Structure formats: structure tokens, C-alpha cells
Amino acid sequence: MKKVLVLHGINLNMFGKRDPAHYGTTTLKEIDARISEWAAELGFEVECFQTNHEGEMASRIHAAHEENVDAVVINAGAWTHYSYGIADALAILKAPIVEVHMSNIHAREEFRHHSVIAGLAKGQICGFGVDSYHLGLIAASNLIKVEN
């Protein structure tokens, strides 16, 4: 069975508590449950991983390379805008990458408009709340089908 790795970056463990105007009230645990349901509907295995530690995220990405995951969906949180370490780790992957954000990063503060990940990703989905993850999984599923 194909496997998609969903990566949640820094501060995303605070979904449901942090800035509900931008991120809503759904918790990360609830988001992960929905992700599992959507993945089952799309016919692939999914693993969700969240950390607030950049080195741990890089290590999980390195492990994904060794595991030959079929696709990665990533919401790197604030790391999106400045973490060249995360970007360098993602560049190692052979699997397609889909970047997602719950809020529309292009309609927010200027510093959020730039993504160091975007150039590595097949595409970026943002601004649709929790549905950004669903759309990201659909994109990942389609990319897996195209690349195999």
C-alpha cells in the first residue's frame, strides 16, 4: 500500500487554541483523525508527525527518504518562511511534496508571503482551513498515481 507522510511543523500542536480567526478551532488531534479518514478513502496509508524542534523534523524527513515514502504533505508552520534546514532536508526526497497551510499565507503579514519550501513542492494549497489538508492529500494521491 502506498504511504503518505503528513508533516506538521512548529506551533501546529496548538491548533484549536491559537489564533482561531486564522486557524479555526479544530485541534491537531482532530485534524489527524480526519487525515486518517481521508487517506483511507483515497486508498493509501498515512502517518502524521508533528514537532516543534527543527532537528527532529529534519530527522523525520531523512527517515522518510530511507523509507521511500510515496509522497509528503507538509505544513511547516513558521519554518515555511525561513528554515533552509527543513528545505534542504526536503530536497533530499525523491517523493513528491505538497505544501499546505490552513490560512492564506499570501493574504497575511508580508513575512509570510515567502516560502522556502515552495520551490521544492509540486504545489501549494493554502487558505481553506482544515480542507487544505484534504486537498493536499488528494493532490498527493494524484501525484502518486502519475509518478507510478
Swiss-Prot record:
Reactions catalysed: 3-dehydroquinate = 3-dehydroshikimate + H2O
Active site per UniProt: Y23 (proton acceptor), H101 (proton donor)
Classification via Pfam families: DHquinase_II (PF01220)
GO biological process: amino acid biosynthetic process; aromatic amino acid family biosynthetic process; chorismate biosynthetic process; quinate catabolic process
Family annotation (InterPro entries): DHquinase_II, DHquinase_II_sf
EC number(s) recorded for this UniProt protein: 4.2.1.10
Annotated keywords: Amino-acid biosynthesis, Aromatic amino acid biosynthesis, Lyase
Site features described as Transition state stabilizer, chain residue numbers: R18
Pathway annotation from the record: Metabolic intermediate biosynthesis; chorismate biosynthesis; chorismate from D-erythrose 4-phosphate and phosphoenolpyruvate: step 3/7
Binding of substrate, residues: N75, H81, D88, M102, S103, R112
GO molecular function per UniProt: 3-dehydroquinate dehydratase activity
Similarity comment: family membership: Belongs to the type-II 3-dehydroquinase family.
Record note on quaternary structure: Homododecamer.
NCBIfam families in alphabetical order: aroQ, PRK05395.1-2, PRK05395.1-3, PRK05395.1-4
PANTHER family found in the cross-reference section: CATABOLIC 3-DEHYDROQUINASE
Function as written in the Swiss-Prot or TrEMBL entry: Catalyzes a trans-dehydration via an enolate intermediate.
Name of this protein: 3-dehydroquinate dehydratase
Organism: Syntrophotalea carbinolica (strain DSM 2380 / NBRC 103641 / GraBd1) (Pelobacter carbinolicus)
